[in-house]
From Swiss-Prot:
It comes from Wigglesworthia glossinidia brevipalpis. GO terms for molecular function: GTP binding; GTP cyclohydrolase I activity; zinc ion binding. Toroid-shaped homodecamer, composed of two pentamers of five dimers. The gene is folE. Keywords: GTP-binding, Hydrolase, Metal-binding, Nucleotide-binding, One-carbon metabolism, Zinc. It holds the Pfam family GTP_cyclohydroI. This is GTP cyclohydrolase 1. GO terms for cellular component: cytoplasm. Belongs to the GTP cyclohydrolase I family. Signal peptide: none annotated. Its EC number is 3.5.4.16. Zn(2+) binds at C109, H112, C180. Pathway: Cofactor biosynthesis; 7,8-dihydroneopterin triphosphate biosynthesis; 7,8-dihydroneopterin triphosphate from GTP: step 1/1. It catalyses: GTP + H2O = 7,8-dihydroneopterin 3'-triphosphate + formate + H(+).
Amino acid sequence: MEVLTKEALLVKNALLNKGIETPFKKIYEKNKPDIHKISKYIKKIMDLLNLDLNNDSLSKTPNRIAYMYIEEIFSGLNYNNFPKITLIKNTSKINDLITVNNIVLNSTCEHHFLIFEGKAIVSYIPDKILIGLSKINRIVDFFSKRPQIQERLTNQILVAIQILLDTKNVAVAIKAKHLCVKARGIKDSHSKTLTLSLGGVFKSKQNIKKEFLKDF
């Protein structure tokens, strides 16, 4: 079993303490899902749908889905995959707004296991620590690679960055289109969902909140 990085442990414990961690049944790092077992159950589902698993086009589908779940679209369930974080001392005393916008995200609705996709914007006002800009994108990507609801995803990103940078002054917004809304039920192909999570001065000062949202 791999040892989690200090940053991964900090973030994981913070989410647990705030009650916004993804609802795990067991500790994932000790019980990594078995691709072969998942493949077997996918095969059973396909068989119950009367699909011919001897067909060349379908025969490898159970293995493909199992691999995709564990190694790709749900890889964020495993904190061993938490990105390596570059933290920098704020020796330049930077205290202005830093924003990364147009962060493309793809996640999976935990209710129907259908994709939702959109963009995120993340801002923070540094105190003693700065973070490498690409690491913000990687944090968004890590938490997106789970069965999710958009509201919790937004909060998880916020808390992760607050903990790593030791500041409350963080804001996260996500605007996404959900395939579970587009492809089933109401079948609305136009609507998008906007979620906000604000901390520190982003919540208490309207001018800073307005600045954060101006290009979103």
